[in-house]
Amino acid sequence: MTDGAPEIDRLDEPPTRRRRQLWAALTVFLLLLTCGLPAALLVGAVRDAGSRTVLDRLGTPAPDPATLAARQLAERITAQLDRQATALLAGNRAGFLAVAEPAAHPDLRRRFAALRALRVTVWQASPNGVPETVPGRPGEWRLLVEFRYCFVTPDCRPSPVLIGTRWKESGEQPRLVAMEESRSAATGTRPWETSELVVAVGARTLVATTPALRGQLPRLMSQAEAAARVADSYAVDGAPPDRYRVFHAGRAEWQRWYGGGRPKWTGGYAVTVGGGHHEVVLNAEGLSPAGLDDLLRHELTHAASLPERGYPGTSTWWLVEGLAEFAGVDGQPVDRYEGLDEVRRLAAGGWTGRLDDLSPADDAPADRVAGSYGISYLAVRHLVDRFGQERLLDFFRAVVHERRAVAEAAEEVFGEPWPALHDACVAYVRGLSG
């Protein structure tokens, strides 16, 4: 399962120098404040003076004290974030905690331990905007911070996450009062923000779970490594992920990680987190060892095949899920597919006969969901049997990555009109389910 076509926080471009970004934002803010003044009173330019950006205003006074104080505080917070990042990457927990008030230490200890267990190799912190006073808390400021991270591989493209931080002025250096949970509408809260984690790292995967499920970790790692070898062959752009990131959730974590709230029929999902990465989450409840193999192949194939921005929409759901199901069955004969009974029931009634009308509702019953996945698998299977896996992946790239019309992509890749191919796929499904 995927999260459809999520719009992630648009924070995935290579970071600029932190201070330059911050000063540019402050400059725009100041210009907006003065836009109502007559043009004759404002003649200015922005010049880069070493490590500072200065806004010159001929005939106007220096910035007001509040603006100047916010700028200076932002510089000091940035320095503290830099110290904390250096300590994290060095494995220096005392240094990681040193920038914070004691009340924040328990949460920061958990974050530090989880990130170190995940083998964090890149940790960059850049202020997003300027500090704002916290109402009712004199001397306390809130600042959004964009954190970028890599696990295991030091040269990966970092994944971004935007987190609110609160700071208290205390002498020369501000002190971190609290680090909030990220609450992106698209991705929700990452596991390392909220949970203790135990982690195993293999040649192709990083697998994390909770201490309560520690005993399952060796088997999970073995199965994930086997699934990764299958998923690698579905990397549409030819470059599989540096590591597949898999998070195995207990009941409480399933409701909390990445925002929770998944449909009841969901056994796992892949969510895009930026930096070219999709993180896979598995629901520990109700998974059998055999079912876990199929599910891992399915979800890791999403991570290998999907573009960073997600897929175009529900009309292409059948292609996205059909490819993942095709990888999940891993070459087994079609008559051994476990969902054939559900396919027969859905094909006999309740389905319009259109592939672009297969995406199940969140509250759909389990047999309707299984039938939708099964029909999608059979349609993709038919296309692979006729044209081969390589051309199917070319078709997938054109439709899902390049977002071209299905009819246009079919003509170019398969050399046949899409209406005829669509009808052939449907006939194949009905022939097997009749």
Question: Which residues does each PLM region occupy?
Answer:
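Short, low-complexity N-terminal intrinsically disordered segments enriched in polar/charged residues
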Residues: 33-34, 39-90
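Second-shell loop/turn segments in exported
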Residues: 67-72, 83-85, 206-221, 281-291, ...
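Short solvent-exposed beta->alpha transition segments
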Residues: 69-72, 90-136
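Surface-exposed, charged secondary-structure patches
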Residues: 112-158, 286, 297
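Juxtacatalytic substrate-recognition/specificity segment
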Residues: 199-312, 316, 347
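Acidic/His/Gly-enriched intrinsically disordered linker/tail segments
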Residues: 272-275, 291-295, 310-434
